[in-house]
UniProtKB/Swiss-Prot annotation:
Chaperone among keywords: no
PANTHER family attached to this UniProt entry: DNA REPAIR PROTEIN RECO (PTHR33991:SF1)
Keyword DNA damage: yes
Origin species: Caldicellulosiruptor saccharolyticus (strain ATCC 43494 / DSM 8903 / Tp8T 6331)
Gene: recO
Protein name (Swiss-Prot/TrEMBL): DNA repair protein RecO
């Protein structure tokens, strides 16, 4: 029997049979996979600790035609403490849902895995969660190839715009002459902040600061655009109204 090693974070868990779980795990080596964690719900199971969302571990898998099975695993980093705070649970669930929605089974994207781990680490260390989410949204769009055009009008290619509008339909900014009825006017400050985040290395993202007013605009812009890209609602957004 062949053993396969991979490092990954559990995105979701679903109870299976009497004492097991089916885990959705995002790994660097195998991409997003589903794996059986057999008997992990038993009290003394050695797989219990690694079979929960927000746990980053090194796994050893075996594979049948149908599914991976976890042979053994050891925790590298636990973000489970985040779930002790209701607000942070909602924020982290949002990040997880975006990853799970953008990444297909067996699709690899190490940039997004690093982004997710970095973002969860920032939440764990007390970074402003709204800022973490805005950064995550922008970087996610870059790493998946859906980042909009912000440097010139997507229709006429004019740059240095006096007034800037965002076209959700055309995935980028448009000038006053090219704008349509439902396009959203945004300030130069919004565009500049997006481009700064886009150009900043993951290791330096903790230095980014976003004011409350700017965050509100970015949140509307990014969440609306992401829902259009995914062609579905992001369910966890409904829970943001409960955040204090």
């Amino acid at each position: 029997m062949k053993f396969i090693k991979a490092k990954g974070i559990v995105l979701k868990d679903v109870n299976f049979e009497e004492s097991s779980k089916i885990l959705t795990i995002f790994t660097s080596e195998l991409g997003k996979i589903q794996a059986l964690s057999k008997n992990c719900r038993r009290t003394l199971s050695p797989l219990g600790a690694v079979s929960q969302p927000l746990i980053y571990s090194e796994f050893v898998f075996t594979k049948t035609k149908e599914i991976y099975s976890i042979s053994s695993a050891s925790v590298i980093e636990s973000f489970f403490d985040i779930t002790q705070n209701v607000d942070l649970t909602i924020y982290s669930s949002y990040l997880i849902e975006l990853v799970d929605s953008f990444i297909q089974i067996e699709q690899k994207n190490e940039d997004i895995l690093r982004l997710l781990l970095n973002s969860l680490y920032m939440l764990k260390k007390g970074a402003d969660p709204e800022t973490v989410c805005r950064i995550f949204e922008i970087k996610m769009l870059i790493f998946t190839g859906f980042f909009p055009q912000f440097t010139q009008c997507v229709k006429c290619q004019k740059s240095n715009l006096s007034r800037i509008f965002f076209s959700f339909k055309n995935a980028g900014v448009v000038c006053a002459e090219c704008k349509e009825e439902n396009d959203m006017e945004i300030s130069l400050e919004v565009v500049e902040k997006i481009l700064i985040i886009a150009a900043t290395d993951l290791k330096k993202l903790s230095k980014i600061r976003i004011s409350k007013n700017l965050n509100n605009v970015l949140k509307t812009l990014m969440t609306t655009y992401i829902k259009l890209v995914l062609q579905k609602d992001v369910k966890i957004l409904d829970f943001f109204k409960f955040i204090k």
